[in-house]
Structures are given as structure tokens and as C-alpha cells.
Amino acid sequence: MREPDFLNHFLKKGYFKKHAKAVLALSGGLDSMFLFKVLSTYQKELEIELILAHVNHKQRIESDWEEKELRKLAAEAELPIYISNFSGEFSEARARNFRYDFFQEVMKKTGATALVTAHHADDQVETILMRLIRGTRLRYLSGIKEKQVVGEIEIIRPFLHFQKKDFPSIFHFEDTSNQENHYFRNRIRNSYLPELEKENPRFRDAILGIGNEILDYDLAIAELSNNINVENLQQLFSYSESTQRVLLQTYLNRFPDLNLTKAQFAEVQQILKSKSQYRHPIKNGYELIKEYQQFQICKISPQADEEEDELVLHYQNQVAYQGYLFSFGLPLEGELIQQIPVSRETSIHIRHRKTGDVLIQNGHRKKLRRLFIDLKIPMEKRNSALIIEQFGEIVSILGIATNNLSKKTKNDIMNTVLYIEKIDR
């Protein structure tokens, strides 16, 4: 194929119609170098300002030399280039996260709204097969998205309909580590795919066909369920269990960076079936909020997180707060659940310390400031310590000390339990 053929495809698809500035992820491999050539040659026709971004993973001797060559290439093309060096223990996942964090920084700095990557059809086949082997959810078997909006940016993969063999042989850097089978993707590319193609020479086309079919089903379900308010639990639960699962999965497609595992999805389902109000951190900065017959998934707000001064928890309710799950009168299962005797007669307040706070110990009121000094509690831990209060008295300083009322008084007043579980944030 000739370069104008790729240009015509880009124009027909309208990839850059909404964008004035685009960042190209430039690895130096054949696919990204050819994409660089097409985009830099036809900037005017595509009406974009091109910005280059490269990550030096520091995993090969040649990587520093390649970085210098890419700087020269950018200078010759009179294009800006941003480069970052990966450090720390290397893994595919850590490197990928590092790259995308860096690309977003570049976009924020330059005002670009599109990130362009050179993923092609061969990458798509490998990705779908990897996910299938790992046992991912069906909707993820549609593979890499051609266009994907994440927050305020759009990721564009204009080569996704082309195979690597469609690209002309031009100057590029060959990563010799791609021939090693140390990483899963390399084993897919070098070992598994060739063996499967012996059974079916059109295996790659078959995998791509399955991915496209799953994508069609996803889009059709989204369109057909457009008038269903999934966040209304009364409406959601009016359908069969199977339909509920599909509707909930379709709803989760609204949050492309959430990516719940099967176990996490099952946990969300269980929470939605609970009768109590609920606030639960899920993953990647999202939380699930359930209030009676309504729920929503949203980014954790500062008010609901570390900056909240005081939280009020009512009987038969649960709430996630600053890395803990508090359950008032509703038992939690697990080996590391803390239990604090409390009363069901009034709400519980969870907060940080205040000037003048006291705790009753051995029948005596002791100021928290003196207690912290006696226990040699570091200042940082003093400031972050969570205070559990009821009836205007401190019941517990989480993980540090508890109000030790007499047994008779405790039995008379404390007629239920506050369950506390440490959770990941």
C-alpha cells in the first residue's frame, strides 16, 4: 500500500476531525515510524499539529542511541519531541502504565487532545488471544478500541485495520528482545500463534472476526438498553439475573478505566442486592454509592475521602472512609475484622482529633494529647488517627486505644457492634 492510501483511510474515518493537536507515541519500531512518516507528511491535509513522545525503557544497550536518533529525526522534521526514561523494576504492566502516564503529562503540557498509537491488526489478534487465555470477561474480547475516550482525551489507533505486512520497509529500530519468550505477548507472537495457524491458516482472521462480532453485540445491547435506567435498582431487578448482569456490564462500559475483574464485578452485584445504604471504593479511584433504590459509580470526591472533617454513620448502614469499611450492626466476614461494642440507639461519628479530646480509661478522663505522648505515638499518626464517637464520648481511637467502660455499664449501653475492615484504596 502507498502512503496516500493510508491518508485516504484516515480522512474517510475522520480520526482527527475534532482535534487540532495530536501526540504520537513514537517507539521507533516499524509501525510507529511509518505512522510518523504518514502523519508528518500529511499534517496539512489532516489539519493537525503533530507532537512526538518517546519513552526510553532503558532495557537494551541500544536504547540510548535510539533516543538520540529520534531526537535527530524530530529536529529534521521540525517537530517537538518529549522523552522520558523508565526507572525501577521492569514489567510489561509497569512499563505500560508509565508510558500512558507520561503521554497524558505531555498532552496536558501541550494542550493536545488526541493520543495516536501505531497498534495494528496483528497487535489486535495477540491482545484478544492473551485475554482469552487469561479468562477475561466476554466484552473485553472485542480487543483494542479503534477510538477510545478516556477523561478529556481521545486515544486513536488509525492502523488497527492494517497488518504489519501492509507497511513498507522504512528506517526503524528492531527490538531484539521481541524474539525472546520471556514475556507473555512474545510467547503468543512467536510460539502460540504459529502453532494455531498450522491448524487453521486463517486463524488470525477468525480471531479478528470474533472480536468484531463481540463488539457488534456490545454496541447493539447498549443501543437497545439506552432507555433503561440501570441506576434505578427497582427497574434493574425487574429483569432476569442474566439480563441484570448484561445490563450492569453495559453500564460499566461508561467507565473505560475501571476494568473490574470477575470477582470485583460479583462484589458490586452483591452490594447492589444489599438493603442498606452503602458507599464503597471499588478500583482506580472510583466508588460505588448506593442509597435505597438508586446507585451510581463515580470518581471519589475529596469531600468523601481524606478531606472530610466528620462522617456520620447510622445504625444498619455501612460506609467506606479513609481506607476502612465501617459496618454499624451489620456483621462483616473475615479474619482481620475489628469489633467495637457500641449502642444502636444513636448514630456514630467518625472524625480526626480535636483540641480538648478526652478518653475514659480506668474510670479516669485522659486527654488525647497526653495519651499520645505516653504511648509515644508519632505526630503523623496522631493527625491521621480516626476517632469513633458516640453520645458525645470517644468510644475508640482506631488501632490505638478504646474506652474501657465497666462491664456492667458496657452491657447496659453497648447493645450492638461496629465492625471495621481495612480495605485497599
Swiss-Prot record:
UniProt entry keywords in alphabetical sequence: ATP-binding, Cytoplasm, Ligase, Nucleotide-binding, tRNA processing
Enzyme Commission number, as recorded: 6.3.4.19
UniProt xrefs under Pfam families: ATP_bind_3, TilS_C
GO molecular function: ATP binding; tRNA(Ile)-lysidine synthase activity
InterPro entries named among the record's database cross-references: Lysidine-tRNA-synth_C, Rossmann-like_a/b/a_fold, TilS/TtcA_N, tRNA_Ile_lys_synt, tRNA_Ile_lys_synt_N
GO biological process per UniProt: tRNA modification
SMART domains with a match to the protein in the record: TilS_C (SM00977)
Domain of life assignment: Bacteria
Known function: Ligates lysine onto the cytidine present at position 34 of the AUA codon-specific tRNA(Ile) that contains the anticodon CAU, in an ATP-dependent manner. Cytidine is converted to lysidine, thus changing the amino acid specificity of the tRNA from methionine to isoleucine.
Name of the protein this chain belongs to: tRNA(Ile)-lysidine synthase
Organism: Streptococcus pneumoniae (strain JJA)
UniProt gene name: tilS
